[in-house]
Structure formats: C-alpha cells, structure tokens
Amino acid sequence: MSKNERMVGISRRTLVKSTAIGSLALAAGGFSLPFTLRSAAAAVQQAREKVVWGACSVNCGSRCALRLHVKDNEVTWVETDNTGSDEYGNHQVRACLRGRSIRRRINHPDRLNYPMKRVGKRGEGKFERISWDEALDTIASSLKKTVEQYGNEAVYIQYSSGIVGGNMTRSSPSASAVKRLMNCYGGSLNQYGSYSTAQISCAMPYTYGSNDGNSTTDIENSKLVVMFGNNPAETRMSGGGITYLLEKAREKSNAKMIVIDPRYTDTAAGREDEWLPIRPGTDAALVAGIAWVLINENLVDQPFLDKYCVGYDEKTLPADAPKNGHYKAYILGEGDDNTAKTPQWASQITGIPVDRIIKLAREIGTAKPAYICQGWGPQRQANGELTARAIAMLPILTGNVGISGGNSGARESTYTITIERLPVLDNPVKTSISCFSWTDAIDHGPQMTAIRDGVRGKDKLDVPIKFIWNYAGNTLVNQHSDINKTHEILQDESKCEMIVVIENFMTSSAKYADILLPDLMTVEQEDIIPNDYAGNMGYLIFLQPVTSEKFERKPIYWILSEVAKRLGPDVYQKFTEGRTQEQWLQHLYAKMLAKDPALPSYDELKKMGIYKRKDPNGHFVAYKAFRDDPEANPLKTPSGKIEIYSSKLAEIARTWELEKDEVISPLPVYASTFEGWDSPERRTFPLQLFGFHYKSRTHSTYGNIDLLKAACRQEVWINPIDAQKRGIANGDMVRVFNHRGEVRLPAKVTPRILPGGSAMGQGAWHEANMSGDKIDHGGCVNTLTTLRPSPLAKGNPQHTNLVEIEKI
C-alpha cells in the first residue's frame, strides 16, 4: 500500500469495503456508519473533488457566477456565488436555474465532438467526420478564393450573442476573435444594429444623443414606476440581473408600479399595482392620449420644455420645420393630420379604456419623481423607432429627465467595471448593412442601396455575401425571421458559397454549415467576464477550465490561430502577436490594472473567482450633468438639447425611399403598420402574434435541456375569449399559421394575454422536415415572423405578425 493510499489511519481499500458493508446495513435499517468511517469517507470525497469558478455567459444580460464541483474530470454538481454578506448593494450573484443546469449542457449527449463537413443538402443535418487539418485547410482555401474572386466585402461575420460576456470567447461580431482575424486579412462586411435593440438604439439618439437611462436601484427615490413592456423577471431574473434590485428598491420607496404590456408577465406577477393590457404596436398612441391630458390639464413642465428641449411648441421649433410642425400641435390636432389625440382616440387604438388613460395621465403628471421606462419588446415592432421615441415623451413632458428617481424613458442603465477586450483592430472594409438584412445581401446584395436598404459607407453594395462565419450563434436560422424563406436562400449554394459554423451542438443553424467545428464552452477555458445589467454593483468573474479538453473540441482562439497560419505567416503574427490565450488575458488584465489600480491582481482575482464593486456614486442618473448645466454639458444632438423635433429625421424622411405604409417622422408620432391591429389582413389572420423571452431559455441557449423543457413547455398563449371561439381548451394541440409557415404546439388558454393577441416564447429549436411539409413541431416563433425590416433602423420587427390558430 503506497503512502498516497493511506488517509487518517484507514486505507482506501478498507474504506470502500467498510462503506459497502455500512450501506447494506443502512438499507436493512440495522445501524448507521460509525462517525470515524463517515469522516474518512468525507475526506476521500474532498480529496478527489475540486471547485472551479465559472460563469453563465449567455445573452440574458446577467452573467452569473457558477461554482462547479469537479470529480474525476467530470462536473458532478453546480452551485452559485456564495461570497460576501449578501446585502442589498453587495449581494451574491446567484445564477438562475438555467445557469445551474449547465452540467447538463456540458455533458449533453448531443455535444459536437469532432470537425465535420456537410455531405447532404444544407439544412438536412447530414455530415461526416473529418480531421482538423482538412477542416482548417478547407476554410482557409475557401476564404482565399472568396477574397480573390469577390473581395473582402463578400465575407460576413454572422450576428451572434451566444457568448456575450467573454473576453477571448466573446461572440458578438464587432468584438469577437473572428473579427480580429478578418481584420488581419483585409476585413469583412460590417453590420450595425442588433436583434435585441435595433429600433430603440437607432431612434433614441435622435432625441437624446444616446440611449441612457437611470439605474434600477434609483427607483428607491421614485414615487411612481411605469414599465412599458419591460419584463426583467424573465429576461434578467437572476442575481446578476435587476429583478432583485427592482424589488429591493421598491421596498425602500414604496413606489406604485404600473405594468403596460399585452401579456401579464412574471415581472407583474403580484409585484405590480396595476396591469394595463395593450394591443401590440400601439404604445405610441397611448402616449399621445396621455400627452393630450397632460397638456389640457396643465400638467406639463413648461419651464423644462422651454429650457432643455427643441420642438415642443412654436417657441422652440427649428427654423427649417413647417408651421405647426411641433409636438403640441400634433397632439392637439393642429398639425397635418388634423386629428386631436384625445383619450377617446387612443382608446380605440390601444384597447385601454378612456377613463384609465385619463387616470394614468394624471398619475404621471402629479407623481414626481416618476421612473418611466421601456423594455425592448415594444421597439421590436415595425413602428418600433416611433414607439421608442414616443415613450420617452412622458418623462420629457413632465420634467423627469436628469433627476434622481426619474428616468429618460429608456431601459435601465447599469454600473460596470470596464474590461479590456481582445482588440479587433481596424476593418479596412468601411461598408456596413443592418444585421437583419444579411439574407437580402446574399440574395440580391448589389441591388441594396443606402436610401432604400440602409447600406452605410457607400451608395450600394458591390457584391453579395459569399462566405459566412457563424460562431456561437443561432441567428443563421432559428433566431432570424421567416425560416422557410431563409432556408430557400441558404440552401442555394450558388448564392452563399461557404458557411463555417463553430458550435457546441447541432443547432438549427449548424445544420446549414459546410464546415462544422466543435467549440469549447466558456466554462471549459480560461477567460474573464464582467457583469452586464446589474444595477449599481459591478463585478468580474475569473473562469478557469472546469475539465480538460475532451474528444477533439477546441477553443475559438486556437481554431482561428490555425486558420491564420494557413492564410500566411504575416496574418498569423498579426493575429496572435505571439501570445497564447492565457498570455492575452494576462496582457489585457495588466492594462486594466494600469487604468484601475483598485482591482485585485491577476493572481488574486484568479483565486477569488469573483470580485464585486458598488457604484461609488450610488446610482446612475441619466443626463444629470445636462440637467444641472445644459450649456456646459450639452447632449450629443445637433442642437445640444433634447430634440422632440429632429431636423435630421425630417431630412431622412424627405430623401429615403419608403413604402407607402412606412413612416419616418421628425416627431414621435403614432403610425399604423403592416400586419398591425388595424390591418386588412386580419380578416384572414385575425390574431396578433408576438414572441417573448422565455425563462427556460436565453434566446435558444439551453433550449435543448430536457429538464428545462419539461418545467416550461413550449406553448402558444391565447385568451379564453379567442380560444372559446375556436373550440380550443387548455393543453390542446393547435396549429398556428400564416402565409409564411405553420407551427404545431400545445395551447395555453389564459387571461394573462389580451383578447386578439397571441404569444410564443421565442428561442424554441426549429424542428421541421424541410424537404417535406416544413411544418415546425419545435414551436419556433420565427417560422411565422416577417423578414420585412423596420423603416429607419432596418431592424427586425419580429413582434409584428398576424396568424390564425386552429385546433388539430
């Protein structure tokens, strides 16, 4: 017996033998193990088990700490952050059940283990195993050919948010290692916008010059909270998110909370004082009706509007604006449409009773400070840019901007410890498209123009997309719109000639790869991840490899370094700078320390696992400096003020090519949309359909975990009134369909959704026979969503859809 086999006077062999006997005795109920044997068993367990810090770095906006227990190179169980005193402002970053189920992702039987190449048609999911050399040689050869034949503008890095928090592992196209590689090789076609925030990110800068909002924790200073489509209890429900902070802040302020949403969300769920169900896409009409009351009952903050704003009334209307082109004229019916935006007018559009609109207006007009915010659901409509700017009008009209306890009308901001990321270098290609328009760029790229399709950097595209990198993302198919149309475009190999997918699983997007590479998960490699939306407490998490590399899975940095070698020694040197992944992390963290000496050292952070820091200013107040001194601290708008009327938008509206039913306005007006509540198409497809963030998934991540799928099954929500008309009972299998496709799944008959509306959790994995009937049995909402972009941002209006639902 070796020395290593001896522990506290008992051998491993004796312990195992004794434990087996003891277990039999326990089963028989005869006696319990002696204390010494139990202590020895625990000692053996402890000696063989280690705890490794990791993180859930998916795109929910939280990024939570994980403590993974590892035994014999396998994760046995997972716990979360247990450090600190766990007090408000210095709380534990506790992962939700998604993050805590990560062991099931790591050990999932469907993990990709080897490089593969496609042998069937794109989308069939037929592949054969190949060597890494063959895979890398094929990629490099195809990339060289594409650049030589079409130029670098024909190479595109697909939108991805599967790994948003990582430094070395980050998948966001503008900040990923793939972007760095391409910038070392002549660049690639750029993209702007995002599937999360395209419309609001585009629109709000025309009003404020940025997208800032007060931090959630500032609600402790509020008297009223009004949330338009903001649902953190499902989108950011963990300890790294803002739900905990929202509850704690309201405990301090006792602020009344009103939730305005087509669906009674988990954020409401007893936390709210009132839920106002509203027709999807009509938030701007509600705002206009509220504004009419505020103006007519003298509840607007006129001194604020005069001093800080442009375009509220004739006093501050820009010289280039038409007569009566100001916001007040629009509301009172003195503008071009000659329609007063009365509560009666708004009620017909929104479905909210007249008396409730009047009451809400008076509540907003008399409660100060009021925290008025919006989630990203309302802006993900065909009129989302107008909606985002309209909601911002409520804090503007009442002077709640730039003060503690107030807000700008935007989504909440957060305090973050600034991290040094892997530099992506400059892109020699200056052309960009909306991230939602990539299928158009494959199908008819050279026909896309600046004034019709939003091409930036030149008047039109010169070439279509011919080569796609898809790293850690499912937007190639599952998260993009109109899956059946997207399938047609991708399956045509004469259009896009090479698709490289780097993934963990055979996702809906991976089935369309020409070369499919097995990636490591973030918890399987070293990285540093910062917080995202976490109120007023920032943190850093140091990830260490939870297990050794298994099968032939490789980290993204190794994969791209090997491709760089094959593109030439100069590309390889420029990409790596002679550093390994660990050396890059040390180099980047040293730069962080130089800028922020209060941080722990690299080795200290590695040992700590997580480092937390509270916002030294207490709470972030958006535009406070501007409010305090507008001349010394002007906004980043042309006038330096809040632009209710935007001359820049007026110019765009005059010069862009728009469809007859598209509206770009210098004012935050309400406009009907295609497939909206008042569309003629409702005669055929009478129900509005929108998606929502489902708590069992983060978009499509965790969508293949059986335990989570069982806990939260994929369903279509339908109101009892609409269900009764169709003979549908709760749990019935139904077909949800329109002219784009058909989905089959169970019905959830519930009063938690307004009549005339329906909803499905987005991110369910598409599951259809694409060579046959194309009926989706996985319940993916994007089988039904539109590919038509919004007018200004050219963003994804994936909540603007009409469907019919029938019992099967």
Regions found by a protein language model. Give the residues of each.
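Phosphate/diphosphate-binding loops
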Residues: 497-498, 545-564
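A glycine-rich phosphate-binding loop feature that marks nucleotide/adenosyl-phosphate handling sites
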Residues: 160-161, 307-310, 364, 407-418, ...
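N-terminal export/assembly segments and adjacent metallocofactor-ligating motifs
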Residues: 2-299, 325, 466, 471, ...
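Extended redox/cofactor-interaction regions of prokaryotic respiratory oxidoreductases
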Residues: 2-3, 173-260, 267, 285, ...
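Active-site phosphate/pyrophosphate-binding segments
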Residues: 323-324, 328-442
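Long, well-ordered, tryptophan-enriched scaffold segments
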Residues: 263-367
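Catalytic or ion-translocation cores adjacent to nucleophile or general acid/base/metal-coordination motifs
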Residues: 520-545, 755-756
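Long, contiguous, secondary-structure-rich segments that constitute the structural scaffold
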Residues: 556-608, 700-702, 706-717, 721-808
